[in-house]
A protein has these predicted regions:
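Preference for long, solvent-exposed alpha-helical segments and helix-linker "stalks"
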Residues: 23-278, 289-290, 414-420, 430, ...
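Residue-level recognition of tetratricopeptide repeat
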Residues: 35, 70, 116, 301-302, ...
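Structural signature of tandem alpha-helical TPR/SEL1-like repeats
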Residues: 128, 273-278, 308-314, 343-351, ...
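Canonical tetratricopeptide repeat
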Residues: 66-68, 113, 298, 335, ...
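Alpha-helical adaptor scaffolds
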Residues: 297-309, 316-364
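Alpha-solenoid helical repeat scaffolds
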Residues: 51, 95, 134, 248, ...
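Bacterial Sec-dependent N-terminal signal peptides
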Residues: 1-27, 69, 308
C-alpha cells in the first residue's frame, strides 16, 4: 500500500464517475471531501466521508485505499478503545485493494502489509502471521521486497520451530530461500549503484539521480541489517551438532536430490563441519549424480580439510571453470581470492579478486580482500618508513570502494578503512615529510600509486 504518490484532486468531473454516480451520487462529493481533509492530515474529519465511499463505492477511485490506510492507522493509534475494530477494517482494506485496483496494488504487497499490521499491533499469533507471509513469499517471491517482512517471515518460523510446531529442515530450507532473496536484491542494488558511481565521483549526477542513488543505498543498508539479524536468529540451530544428525537421518532418502545435496554440503562447509565423514558422503553423492561447479567446489573443501591445498585449489579452479553464471562465478573467484590470501599467495589472491570484479562490478567483498592484501604488504613496498606506511592510504581507499558499490558492506568497509587510515602517516608526519599532495609509486607486487593527502 505504500506508494510514493502525490494526489492532487482538482475537479472531480461528473463524467469520470458517471456509472457510480448513477448508483450513489454522494460518493464523488464525499471522495473530494475526505481527500481534502486527508491531504492536510485531518484524519478524524476525513473518516466519515471516507467510510461512506469505502462502504458504498469501493471501486470509485484508488484514493479510497491510499488515504484509507492513513486514516485507519490514525484511528488505531488515537482510539485505543476501538483499536481492534479499526485493525480489522484495515486488514479488509488490504485484502480488497489489489482486487479492486490490480494495476496499482498487488496481492504480495497487500499480504505483507496485513502481516506487518497484525505483528505491529500484536493482534495475530505467530502461526497466523507466518502463514500470511509464507503465502506472500511462495506465491510471488519476485514481488517480496520488504526487508522487515523478510526478517519477520524467518523469525516467526524459527519461533514456531522452537515451540515444536515446525521441523528443522523447513527452517533451513526457508533460510536458503530468504538469504537467496537478499542476495538477489543486493545484486540488483549493486548493479544500480555501479551505473551511477562514476558520475557521482565526477560530481555530475542530476538531482533525480542523487535521490535514486540515496534511496538504493538506504535499501542496501536495510538488507544489511536484516541479513545479520536473520543469521543471529538462526543461531545455534545451524551448528554441526544439529546439522550432522539431521542430514544423516535424511541422507538415504534424499541422496538423489542434487538441490538438497548442494544445500546440505554448502551449509556444512560454511559452518565448519567439513571434517565430518558425512560431508564426504554428501560431496561424493553430488559429484556422482551431477558433476558441477558446486560439486567440484565442495571437493576442494574436502581436500582443504585434509590439508591437501594443492589438490583443493585444483578443484576450486575446476569449479570456477564449470560455472556459467557470471555472478556465481564471481562469488567462487572471491572465495578463491580469500583462500589464496589466507595462504599468503598475494599475487594470486589479487588476480582472483580482480577477475571477480570484472565479472561482477557490483560485488564489494573483492575490494575488502584487496585492501587487506595491500595493508599486509606495508613492509614490502617503499624504501622509507613514510612510503611503507603510505600503502595504508591505498588500503583505506580500496576498502571504502567496497562500501560504495555494496551498501550491505557499508559498516564493515568503513571500519576497515578507519583501521587502515589509523596506521597511515599522521598529519604531523605528512607536514614534516613535505610530501603533501605528492604521488608515491609502489614498486612492488601491489603496483599503482597513491596521492599523499593534504591533511
Amino acid at each position: 500500500m505504500k506508494k510514493n504518490v502525490s494526489i492532487l484532486f482538482c475537479v472531480l468531473g461528473a463524467a469520470l464517475f458517471s456509472v457510480v454516480s448513477a448508483q450513489n451520487p454522494e460518493c464523488p462529493q464525499n471522495l473530494s471531501i475526505f481527500a481534502e481533509h486527508a491531504k492536510v492530515k485531518n484524519y478524524d474529519a476525513a473518516y466519515e466521508p471516507w467510510k461512506m465511499v469505502y462502504d458504498n463505492c469501493p471501486t470509485l477511485h484508488w484514493a479510497t485505499y491510499h488515504y484509507g490506510e492513513r486514516i485507519l492507522k490514525h484511528k488505531i493509534d488515537s482510539d485505543p478503545a476501538n483499536k481492534a475494530e479499526y485493525v480489522k477494517m484495515l486488514t479488509e482494506l488490504y485484502e480488497t485493494s489489489f482486487k479492486n485496483f490490480p494495476d496499482r496494488y498487488n496481492e504480495t504487497g497487500s499480504l505483507i502489509d496485513k502481516a506487518l499490521l497484525l505483528n505491529d499491533y500484536k493482534l495475530g499469533t505467530d502461526e497466523e502471521i507466518y502463514q500470511v507471509l509464507d503465502q506472500a513469499f511462495k506465491n510471488n517471491p519476485e514481488e517480496f521486497k520488504n526487508p522487515k517482512a523478510l526478517y519477520l517471515y524467518f523469525s516467526k518460523l524459527v519461533d514456531l520451530h522452537d515451540a515444536g510446531k515446525k521441523e528443522l529442515q523447513e527452517v533451513f530450507d526457508t533460510y536458503d530461500d530468504v538469504t537467496g532473496k537478499i542476495a538477489e536484491e543486493n545484486q540488483e542494488i549493486g548493479e544500480t549503484i555501479v551505473k551511477y558511481i562514476e558520475k557521482e565521483e565526477a560530481g555530475t549526477l542530476t538531482s533525480k539521480e542523487e535521490k535514486t542513488l540515496a534511496a538504493v543505498r538506504q535499501n542496501g543498508e536495510n538488507y544489511e541489517k536484516i541479513s545479520g539479524s536473520i543469521d543471529a536468529k538462526l543461531g545455534k540451530l545451524a551448528d554441526c551438532t544439529n546439522l550432522i544428525p539431521l542430514y544423516q537421518k535424511n541422507f538415504e532418502a534424499r541422496k538423489g536430490d542434487a538441490d538438497w545435496l548442494k544445500s546440505a554440503a554448502g551449509r556444512m562447509d560454511s559452518k565448519g563441519c567439513a571434517g565430518d565423514p558425512l560431508f564426504v558422503k554428501l560431496v561424493e553423492a553430488l559429484d556422482e549424480i551431477e558433476p558441477s561447479a558446486s560439486s567440484k567446489y565442495y571437493l576442494g573443501s574436502l581436500y582443504d580439510e585434509q590439508g591437501n591445498s594443492t589438490k583443493a585449489f585444483d578443484f576450486y579452479k575446476q569449479s570456477v571453470d564449470l560455472e556459467t553464471d557470471p555472478v556465481k562465478k564471481a562469488q567462487k573467484l572471491t572465495n578463491l581470492a580469500n583462500k589464496a590470501s589466507q595462504r599468503g599467495r598475494k599475487s594470486s589472491a589479487r588476480q582472483y579478486a580482480n577477475e571477480a570484479l570484472q565479472l561482477n562490478p557490483a560485488g564489494g567483498t573483492p575490494y575488502l580482500i584487496l585492501a587487506n592484501l595491500y595493508a599486509n604488504s606495508a613492509n614490502e613496498c617503499g624504501s622509507t618508513a613514510f612510503e611503507k606506511r603510505a600503502i595504508y592510504w591505498k588500503a583505506a581507499q580500496t576498502a571504502r570502494r567496497a562500501g560504495q558499490v555494496d551498501p550491505s558492506l557499508k559498516s564493515r568497509a568503513a571500519s576497515a578503512a578507519a583501521s587502515y587510515e589509523g596506521r597511515a602517516p599522521s598529519k604531523s608526519d605528512v607536514f614534516s615529510s613535505g610530501m603533501a599532495g605528492k604521488t608515491i609509486e609502489f614498486n612492488c607486487w601491489v603496483g599503482g600509486s597513491i596521492k599523499v593527502p593534504s591533511l
